[in-house]
Amino acid sequence: MGKVIGIDLGTTNSAMAVYEGNEAKIIANKEGKNTTPSIVAFTDKGEILVGESAKRQAVTNPEKTIYSIKRIMGLMFNEDKAKEAEKRLPYKIVDRNGACAIEISGKVYTPQEISAKILMKLKEDAESYLGESVTEAVITVPAYFNDSQRKATKEAGTIAGLNVLRIINEPTSAALAYGLDKKESEKIMVYDLGGGTFDVTVLETGDNVVEVLATGGDAFLGGDDFDNRVIDFLASEFKSETGIEIKNDVMALQRLKEAAENAKKELSSAMETEINLPFITADATGPKHLVKKLTRAKFESLTEDLMKETISKIESVIKDAGLTKNEISEVVMVGGSTRIPKVQERVKAFINKDLNKSVNPDEVVAVGASIQGGVLKGDVKDVLLLDVTPLSLGIETLGGVMTKVIDRGTTIPAKKSQVFSTAEDNQPAVSIMVLQGERELARDNKSLGKFDLQGIAPAPRGVPQIEVTFDIDANGILTVSAQDKNTGKSQEIKISGSSGLSDSEIEKMVKDAELHKEEDAKKKEVIEARNHADSLAHQTQKSLDEHKTNLNENDANEIQNAINALKDCVKNDNATKAELEDKTKLLAQAAQKLGEAMANKNNAEQPKKKDDDVIDAEVE
C-alpha cells in the first residue's frame, strides 16, 4: 500500500496533503503553489487545461471554462438550485438522465467527469512531488452534502484513477488537523465558509478522539455568493448609467466575476477599492468603460443577509449538540471566505470569544484528510474519528409521510432496522421510497431512490412483516434492504444518488480518462519528435551553408533535399511521430558526409605532429 493523499476538492480551489514522517505535509502543485484553482477549460485546439492555466484564459473563453462545478455535483436538473446555477454560470447546464450535466461544443460532461480532471491533475502533481505512483486518497466534502453528492464525489475519484478510501466531512477534517495533539477535552466549533458551501460543526476533541456532536450548513452558500452580490451591484449601476444589461454578455460577465472576486479580497485589508474595467462593452455611441468605487461598508451591506444566515446556522447546530455557546472552548475558522473582516466580527460577537486563526484556512482541510489517510494506513495510531449523519434517512409510508429510520446526528457507520407492513389486503408487493431530510411529508424531502419487494404472500393488511434495514458506511453512503420475514424474500438498493451514472458508465469514464491520458502522452511524443526534427534541420542547414564548399555537388544536394523534406514534415500538422522520426533519421544519415567533411577540414587546418607516441591498437 503506497502513500494515501488527502484531497480538499473545493468549489474555488483544491489542495492536497500527505502524511509522512509522523507529520502531515501540504503538497505543492507543479506550479509551486499550495492550492490549485478548481477550473477546467476546453480550448478551440482541443486541449484541456486545468488549474492556473485554465483560470488565465477564462475571460477570452468564458463559455468553455468550467468553474464552481461542485455547485451542481449530484444535483437534479429540476431542482431550484440548478435553475439558480444556470443563471449564474456562463457555461450550458443540461439535463442528463434527470441530473445536472454541462454541454461543451456539443458534448455532454457530468460534474463527476469535470471534477475527475481536477483530481487527475492533483494526482499527477502529487506523484511528481512524491516520486511514486498514487492510487489511494481520502477526499473531503461539505458536512451538509447529501447522499447523492457524496456518491458523485466518490465517482469522480474513481474516474480519476483513485481508490477513494474514505469520504470525510470538511469541518471534521479540519478538527482532526487542529485537535490531533490536544490531550485536554475541548468542545470546539468549526466555522467553514468556503467558495461554494458553508458548514458549521460542533465537535469534542481530546485524548486522540474527535467526536462530532452536531453539524449543519448550506451546500449553496459560500464566497461565490458574496461575489455574485458585487456582480449584481456593478451590473445594476452600469445599467442605470448606460441602459445596457451587461450580464447578457458572457465575456463581460466573466470580467465582472474576476473583478468582483478581486474587490472582495482587497476589501479584506482596505476600506475602499476601485473596479476599473475599460472597454467592457460597446453600443452605437462607442465603447463603454466600467469604473466604480466600492467601499467595505457597501460590500458589507450587500452581503449582510448571507452573514446573518451563517449565524442562524451556528445557533441551531449548538442547540442540536445540546450545548450553550458558553460551553464552546474554541472557534476554528476554515475556508478562504473567513478572511472577510465582517464575517470574523459577526462570529466573534455571537460566540463572545476570540477566534482561533492558527490554522491556514485554505490548507487545514487537506491536512486533516491526509491524517485520516494516515489512520487508515496505520501510520497514525490510536486516533478515533466519530462522524455523524447530517440529515435524517427514512422511507415514505402510508399517506405520504416520511418515517425516519436513522435520525440526523447518528454516529456513523450505523445500521438500523424497522418493521413495516402492507396497507391493503393481499398486497403482493411493496414499493420502498428512500428519503433524506427533516420534513414530515415525503414530498418535501429529497428522494434518494426507489425499489420494489415482490412476492409477498397473500394476507390481510397489517399482517406481513417487512423489515427495512438502513446501512450507512463510514463514507456516509447508504444501502437499504427490505425482507419479508415470512417468506425470507429480500431486495436491496445501494443508493447511487442522483448522479445518473451506472457502474458501467463510471467504468467507461474511467477508461475514457485513461485513454485521454494515453492520447496526451502520444501528442507529447509527436511534439518532442517535431522539436527534435526542427532542431536537427536548423543545425544541419547552418552547418551546410558554412561548409558546402568542402562537399561535392551530389552530396550537398542530397543533404539539402533531406533538410527540405524534414522541414516540410515539421510544417505538416498531421505528420505522425513515425514520419518525423523517419525523416529525421534520413537527414542524420545524409548529414554524416557533412560531418566527415567538417572533420577533414579541421584536421587539414591543424599542424601536423610527430606520431612517435601513438600506439596502434583497437579500442572496444
From Swiss-Prot:
Tell me, what is an example of a GO biological process annotation in this record?
Answer: protein refolding
Q: Does the keyword Transcription regulation apply?
A: no
What does the record note about the induction of this protein? Answer: By stress conditions e.g. heat shock.
Q: Which Gene3D superfamilies match?
A: 1.20.1270.10, 3.30.420.40, Actin, Chain A, domain 4 (3.90.640.10), Substrate Binding Domain Of DNAk, Chain A, domain 1 (2.60.34.10)
Q: Which GO terms describe its molecular function?
A: ATP binding; ATP hydrolysis activity; ATP-dependent protein folding chaperone; heat shock protein binding; protein folding chaperone; unfolded protein binding
Superkingdom of origin: Bacteria
Similarity-based family: Belongs to the heat shock protein 70 family.
- Known function: Acts as a chaperone.
Its name, as the record gives it, is Chaperone protein DnaK
Origin organism is Helicobacter pylori (strain ATCC 700392 / 26695)
Q: Which gene encodes it?
A: dnaK
